[in-house]
A protein has these predicted regions:
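Solvent-exposed, extracytoplasmic
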Residues: 1-14
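Cytoplasm-proximal transmembrane signaling helix
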Residues: 50-80
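Active-site core of bacterial EAL-family cyclic-dinucleotide phosphodiesterase domains
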Residues: 80-133, 315-318
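Extracellular/periplasmic juxtamembrane segments that couple receptor/chemosensory ectodomains to their
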Residues: 11, 15-54
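Catalytic-site-adjacent helices and loops of nucleotide signaling machinery
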Residues: 78, 99, 124-128, 137, ...
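Catalytic core of bacterial c-di-GMP phosphodiesterases, primarily the EAL and HD-GYP domains
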Residues: 140-215, 291
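EAL-family c-di-GMP phosphodiesterase catalytic domain
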Residues: 41-54, 175-179, 202-212, 228-229, ...
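Short acidic-capped amphipathic helix/loop micro-motif used as an active-site/signal-coupling element
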Residues: 120-123, 149-153, 234, 311
């Protein structure tokens, strides 16, 4: 059965009316909480088959998409288009969190992915997918990204004391900024304001974004000449992943969490993932697995030659003050 929980009430396939959460049947349940949404999903079963687990994964994906769409709708209807984001930048409502990325062999931190968050004074935490899509639709992704750069530069002295020399700073770049006239100058300015010779900036670009731009190869060559590295983000979720590997010079493949989440299930994921890893090695590209949440996933990925791991098994994204005190709680690398 399925139950959707909102505070103390639940809508369940086991009843035609709203029931109290305490009245739900007591049995084995898988629970998924949609982040930043006051909604909990429970999937009930006495035993879980591989087909049921795949169904649960698919159902959770649908719920996640629906929640993101709902947040985007609320954001676009309740807020004055454009004005709120610019006002939020001016009032300091955006902040940065850092998620560690570790070397798969030694389990030592080698860098971070930098992620932006928005705490609205009345709506609370707004999901990143919602406000980023909103900013792209309103042609505000460039000022939003420049504000992200400012926040990173502000944090850089502390990051320099925490991260080793050569540490990777993974930054997501939207297509609206990637092909803006100011992009090259923006990147040069950002690089010049970072502590010299300490960080290696990795620009994370989804394959869906590259599909629309024939000039991508020339731009990527320029970025490499300027000292930046490039990662294909969410690899395997777009339309022409293998074509990009053939035509563009990349440094990293970030394996989408959808592949990682199905490790251990009886699906075709393992052979597909094996093929991706083999291809990356032949192309001299490093691999980063996103969404690593369990020791079993980490073990499988390490045994199959993934270079870097990122996910809740290592750490959730953290604000700067929490990140500077963070100590990894991971097993010895030999385990």
């Amino acid at each position: 059965g399925i139950a959707l929980l909102l505070d103390a009430d639940a809508l369940s396939t086991m009843s035609s009316a709203l029931v109290n959460v305490r009245d739900l049947p007591v049995m084995s349940a898988r629970t998924a909480t949609l982040k930043d949404v006051p909604l909990t999903l429970k999937l009930y079963a006495k035993a879980w088959t591989s087909e049921e687990m795949l169904y649960a994964l698919f159902f959770g994906l649908v719920c996640g998409i629906a929640a993101g769409s709902l947040n985007f709708y609320i954001l676009s209807t309740r807020l004055n288009p454009g004005k709120e984001i610019l006002s939020a930048i001016k009032r300091g409502q955006f902040y940065v969190v850092y998620q560690p990325v570790v070397d798969a062999k030694e389990l030592k931190m080698r860098g971070v992915e930098v992620l932006m968050r928005w705490k609205h004074p009345t709506m609370g935490e707004i999901p990143p997918d919602a406000f980023i899509n909103f900013a792209e639709a309103q042609k505000l992704i460039v000022p939003l990204t420049l504000h992200l750069f400012d926040l990173i530069i502000r944090d850089a002295p502390i990051l320099q004391s925490v991260l080793p020399q050569g540490a990777k700073l993974g930054i997501n770049i939207a297509p609206g900024h990637l092909h803006a006239e100011s992009f090259k100058e923006d990147m040069r300015t950002f690089n010049a304001l970072l502590p010299p010779d300490h960080f290696q900036t990795v620009l994370e670009i989804t394959e869906r974004d590259m599909l629309k731009h024939r000039e991508a190869n020339t731009l990527f060559e320029w970025l490499h000449n300027e000292g930046f590295e490039i990662a294909i983000d969410d690899f395997g979720t777009g339309h022409s992943a293998l074509i990009y590997l053939e035509h563009f010079t990349m440094d990293y493949i970030k394996i989408d969490r959808g592949f990682v989440n199905t490790i251990g299930m009886e699906t075709v994921t393992s052979p597909v993932l094996d093929a991706v890893l083999m291809l990356a090695r032949r192309l001299n590209m490093l691999t980063v697995a996103e969404g690593v949440e369990t020791p079993e996933q980490a073990t499988w990925l390490r045994e199959h030659g993934v270079n870097f791991l990122q996910g809740y098994w290592i750490s959730r994204p953290m604000p700067l003050e929490q990140f500077r005190k963070w100590q990894p709680d991971l097993p010895p690398a030999s385990e």
